[in-house]
Amino acid sequence: VAAAIACALFNLKCKIYMGYKDIKRQSPNVFRMKLMGAEVISVENGSGTLKDACNEALRDWSRNYQKSHYMIGTAAGPHPYPTIVKEFQKMIGEEAKKQILEQENRLPDAIIACVGGGSNAIGIFSDFIDEKVNLIGVEPAGKGIETGKHGAPLTHGRTGIYFGMKSHLMQSQEGQIEKSWSVSAGLDFPSVGPEHSWLNSINRAKYVSVTDIEALEAFQILSKK
């Protein structure tokens, strides 16, 4: 949606790739993007989710790089894209830090954020990495880790090369990328931004996973509070 807004503001053509499953799951956002003049292309390949949309967008850009610009909303992919996304998303951490200091006059004990590709999480983590604050990332365990239908590369994957980056990813013993799963379209991704992989390797951040059911139950509890 942000890309569609920016392109509408500057009168630029906007072509957005989305997996066909995500188009169904995020139909209100698709409507908003089309309303602003964006062309939304349904990706039928593979699992029809974020991973496949990213691949198709990169293929398009590689064919038309002289007259187009590639944009991605997650902190993953080849350099410098993870850094670009972090630099824009870090306002989340800056604002959170400012507000808690104003209200509590101290830093929080912990920062907890969901992790798919990891853009929102790295955004809020960024201003606390050098502070004595626990950083906790929560990956989607989907239907359960034991079922294989999850999206938890940091807690149940291993290091590899994917999407132009070295990071943790879900892969078979033969090194083939496995399908991810999450009730949330934004978390349905088989890898994670490389900075999260690094924070995990140096034990600066702790990463855990929760199932779809657990996440929805937590959402209901929070909504009632």
UniProtKB/Swiss-Prot annotation:
Belongs to the TrpB family. Tetramer of two alpha and two beta chains. Pathway: Amino-acid biosynthesis; L-tryptophan biosynthesis; L-tryptophan from chorismate: step 5/5. The lineage of its organism: Bacteria, Pseudomonadati, Pseudomonadota, Gammaproteobacteria, Enterobacterales. The gene is trpB. It catalyses: (1S,2R)-1-C-(indol-3-yl)glycerol 3-phosphate + L-serine = D-glyceraldehyde 3-phosphate + L-tryptophan + H2O. It is an enzyme of class 4 (lyase). This is Tryptophan synthase beta chain. One of its GO terms (cellular component) is cytoplasm. Keywords: Amino-acid biosynthesis, Aromatic amino acid biosynthesis, Lyase, Pyridoxal phosphate, Tryptophan biosynthesis. The beta subunit is responsible for the synthesis of L-tryptophan from indole and L-serine. Pfam families: PALP.
